[in-house]
Curated annotation (Swiss-Prot):
Function (record text): Required for accurate and efficient protein synthesis under certain stress conditions. May act as a fidelity factor of the translation reaction, by catalyzing a one-codon backward translocation of tRNAs on improperly translocated ribosomes. Back-translocation proceeds from a post-translocation (POST) complex to a pre-translocation (PRE) complex, thus giving elongation factor G a second chance to translocate the tRNAs correctly. Binds to ribosomes in a GTP-dependent manner.
Keywords: Cell membrane, GTP-binding, Hydrolase, Membrane, Nucleotide-binding, Protein biosynthesis
NCBIfam families, per database record: lepA, small_GTP
Matches recorded under SMART domains: EFG_C
Protein name, UniProt field: Elongation factor 4
A GO biological-process term: positive regulation of translation
Superkingdom: Bacteria
Organism of provenance: Corynebacterium aurimucosum (strain ATCC 700975 / DSM 44827 / CIP 107346 / CN-1) (Corynebacterium nigricans)
Cell compartments where the protein resides: Cell membrane
Amino acid sequence: MSTNFAATTFTDPSKIRNFCIIAHIDHGKSTLADRILQLSQVVEERDMRDQYLDNMDIERERGITIKAQNVRLPWIPRSGEFEGQEIVMQMIDTPGHVDFTYEVSRALEACEGAILLVDAAQGIEAQTLANLYLAMENDLEIIPVLNKIDLPAADPEKYALEIAHIIGCEPEEVLRVSGKTGEGVPELLDKVAELIPAPTSEFGEDAPARAMVFDSVYDTYRGVVTYIRMMDGKLTPRQKVTMMATGTNHELLEVGIVSPTMQKCKGLGPGEVGYLITGVKNVRETKVGDTITWASNGASEPLKGYADPNPMVYSGLFPISQADFPDLRDALEKLQLNDASLTFEPETSVALGFGFRCGFLGLLHMEITRDRLEREFGLDLISTAPSVTYRVVAEDGEESMVHNPSDWPGGKLREVYEPIVKMTIIVPEEFVGSTMELCQSKRGQMGGMDYLSEDRVELRYTMPLGEIIFDFFDMLKSRTKGYASLNYEEAGEQLADLVKVDILLNGDPVDAFSAIVHRDSAQWYGNKMTKKLKELIPRQQFEVPVQAAIGSKIIARENIRAMRKDVLAKCYGGDISRKRKLLEKQKAGKKRMKSIGSVSVPQEAFVAALSTDAE
């Protein structure tokens, strides 16, 4: 194995190149990263495995990158103006999914350039576009690349034109590589060395240190490991540092780089990317996007661009067995170490017991969090239907923010505001009609449409977030045979006619099934839930009405028939009045039972009723 000159730090900034890869799910970003690792020989052949940087099982299984990873690599360009010089590449692998835009924006802050990676058989997708615009806003140097040119279905000419049209470059400038065979990858790295600017430091290496945190992970043995990009100054082990957003002080126990495993080093200088370990066990003290500086004589101004990510979707998570409640709390706290954007607070439900109300960035984030809780911590969970945050103004002018249907104020409401999103959908031309129909059925308002090429169309809509968090994505995929891609971003709020629909069992509301829906679809929701519960709840000894209500007005009803014992079996050929006496007696018993009995709802019924259907 060649000696890794990238393993020594305090490199001259002019020899450093920081870049990230922007790509859609499945466009081959992790495979390309694998090839780059092999070419630079930092991973020995025997240790190489596919998707080397995706550490979590769930990342490999779903083929997506969730956490930003970083690697420091040596590269000696074989062509171009830096031929033969030792260049240190720092690659930051970013998530490509819409829910993780904040993770992407922080990773972009740590770079000077980006490789825009597009599948040569599929063309650019909506989320890639969103991340590309984010990179352009940050003034990053963009290197357009078509991947998977070894595929028989690849059409590099067509998509090179499409990319050139979007970025405003010449089609010939779009590089062609194959992450699988490695073709074109060395040329790509030479281009990175040539085109991406070296990091610049605003105040130089002798100024007070300023470093931006772009990720933090929790290590069971060493506490929180914080990944940083140095902007100014130097950090060395045993220094005392302060986190500017939280104002906490720590001692640096270890400073190091990832190449591609963690290696201790003597310290980090301007432009370098590495990690710090301070022995902190509580991740709330290391916020992603925060600025780290020296505790004494530190920098006065933090780096700009730090924002607390706001949850957009809320859902209740309840353990199936109540004994797991403390474990669920521990698990959520551990996940929060890794995931700054996850928020949670305890919640009790009459039907489901104790649990947590959790806030997520979006649906994928919610699904992955739940998956990780079940897989990494072995918990069995029920999650309630997702909801968003509504701003409710009561008749007396009092305002409240509601993100749980059970907190919905009673009485008359003056107005209700719901969050809306601006959505971009890219679909093949033949599916435009059915996609527009779907968006209109979800109360979407069209903002415009553009042809990206002769057979791909970009549609822009403004839609209520509450309508898309449930099953919009699945419906869109099924209507477009899986060819559509979408991206959404927050766009404020709008007035809406929303009501809370309660589901009553035997006259008592069950909080887990309550939902906030638009008045026009309240009837549909009521009918759907009552029918579903009628099939799921086993028959009781007495008749149970399942009703849907808005306030005190019942809008839908189904009955679960009572189980009856045959009381006439012992009455041989007797008189009708004898039979009637027995039936009346049974009826009176059932009536008494109904007034005092409670309905037992099995756990499975909750799980099934709360899971979304393909309706």
